[in-house]
Curated annotation (Swiss-Prot):
Chain residues that bind ATP: 10-15, 123, 132-133, 202
Gene for this chain: adk
Recorded domain comment: Consists of three domains, a large central CORE domain and two small peripheral domains, NMPbind and LID, which undergo movements during catalysis. The LID domain closes over the site of phosphoryl transfer upon ATP binding. Assembling and dissambling the active center during each catalytic cycle provides an effective means to prevent ATP hydrolysis.
Subunit structure, as described in the record: Monomer.
Region (LID): 122-159
Record-linked PANTHER family: NUCLEOTIDE KINASE
Family, as annotated: Belongs to the adenylate kinase family.
Protein name as catalogued: Adenylate kinase
Lineage: superkingdom: Bacteria
Segments of this protein annotated with the region NMP: 30-59
Originating species: Francisella tularensis subsp. tularensis (strain SCHU S4 / Schu 4)
Chain residues that bind AMP: 31, 36, 57-59, 92, 156, 167
Ranges that cross the membrane: none
């Protein structure tokens, strides 16, 4: 099973991706995670990527396809995989097709923009462990302190409201074209994937069940 998981920043893609990964025993390929690891390394490329993300822009197609191509060649992708954060543009989708990457499902987790802004700007993170909190939906016991260590929580530099709005604008402009691309997609070497739209403004468990119900139909 090969799935592309779509969803605006804050839609809960990462959470659903982990659940799908465990249920179907497929590899979760998150370009966001790979990019953050590169930034954390402090390399020249990492510094360049940080500037791009801080400005609310998208990472180049060339870089994204390069890291995805390398990742899907690993043995844990033999049973299938879930692409989280790619493709985001038509050129990326076309490059995946050229690589012979056949997609079975396009799953979009849909959430209204005002809710996404609230979700993202309220996020707080413990850098060392990756534990995530939210000022409204999942607050720490002590404000801005990690529950386990008591260490300070941080806000990602790209989680401010202006940057989030810019990211959402870019997402909607590009994803609409991407969905049309896959809906009209035809190739002698590739079957047309099934497009599934899921209401993401529900409890995590309900979103997961809606996804499973659709995936199990085929």
């Amino acid at each position: 099973m090969r799935i592309i998981l779509l969803g605006a920043p804050g839609a809960g893609k990462g959470t659903q991706a982990k659940i799908i990964e465990q249920k179907y025993n497929i590899a979760h390929i998150s370009t966001g995670d790979m990019i953050r690891e590169t930034i954390k390394s402090g390399s020249a490329l990492g510094q360049e990527l940080k500037k791009v993300l801080d400005a609310g822009e998208l990472v180049s197609d060339e870089f994204i396809i390069k890291i995805v191509k390398d990742r899907i060649s690993k043995n844990d992708c033999n049973n299938g995989f879930l692409l989280d954060g790619v493709p985001r543009t038509i050129p990326q989708a076309q490059e995946l097709d050229k690589l012979g990457v056949n997609i079975d499902y396009i799953v979009e987790v849909d959430v209204a923009d005002n809710l996404l802004i609230e979700r993202i700007t309220g996020r707080r993170i413990h850098p060392a462990s990756g534990r995530t909190y939210h000022t409204k939906f999942n607050p720490p016991k002590v404000a801005d302190k990690d529950d386990v260590t008591g260490e300070p929580l941080i806000t990602r530099t790209d989680d401010n409201e202006d940057t989030v709005k810019q990211r959402l604008s870019v997402y909607h402009a590009q994803t609409a074209k991407l969905i049309d691309f896959y809906r009209n997609f035809s190739s002698t070497n590739t079957k047309i994937p099934k497009y599934i739209k899921i209401n993401g403004d529900q409890a995590v468990e309900k979103v997961s069940q809606d996804i499973f119900d659709q995936l199990n139909k085929r």
